[in-house]
Amino acid sequence: METFPRTIFDDVHQQFRSTFRSWLDNEVVPHHEEWEKAGITPRELWLNAGKQGFLGLNVPEAYGGGDTDDYHFAAIMAEEIGATGVIGSANGITLHNDIVLPYFLGLANEEQRARFLPGMVTGEVIGALGITEPNTGSDVAGIRTTGLKKGGAFIVNGAKTFISNGINSDVVIVVCRTDPEKGHRGISLLLVERGMKGFERGRNLDKLGMHAQDTAELFFSDVEVPAENLLGEEGNGF
């Protein structure tokens, strides 16, 4: 019996907690040490999480998601990941759900939603957010990566570092300067996809902890990103 019982979780939340904890105990905990040594989790884990409904709980049902904006579920996932000691192995899932997906839900147009969200719910498409840079850290106003317009595309050049999900990711929201003359008002968000020419991944960085969370360097050399991969309005990335 809890000394100070919490009242913020109802029966549905607690049922979800039990289901998620069981999944962690059976599918993640037994492999955690192996993945920590490997420095990455297998893509099969993502597909498994998607199959169980643990990805995209906040995504509309039309795209296969859980269609709920109830933050309690995210809180429960964070609590249970911490309680089982598998933060390195499961942190990428919370990043995908709670940091990357809200960008799509808040800024993506209908074509982008239809193209990316179903796969992000099933685990076939893993997301990452590219802000931090080697020389500027996470100072968004000071980023140096550029995405200059050329015809019907943006040409991206620059580098990012310490990017969580950097190795596994299939789509990266890259914060870059599309108009260097406008300061922070010239910053935009571009969706850079796996396989685009000139997009390379560097080292999977060796960290002090959370080793199974792949954290990488990303390099962009004249990457041609089509205009339809602009997320939100041009110049509103800051």
How would you label these PLM feature ranges?
Residues R194-L205, D214-F238:
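A glycine-rich, basic-preceded beta-loop-alpha segment at the flavin cofactor/substrate interface
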Residues G123-I131:
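A short, Trp-centered hydrophobic/proline-enriched beta-strand micro-motif
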Residues M1-V12:
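Intrinsic disorder at enzyme termini
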Residues A153, N157-R201:
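A short core secondary-structure module
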Residues T145-L148:
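A structural signal for short hydrophobic beta-strand segments in well-ordered beta-sheet cores
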Residues T136-D139, F154:
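Hydrophobic, small-residue-rich alpha-helical packing segments that form membrane-like cores
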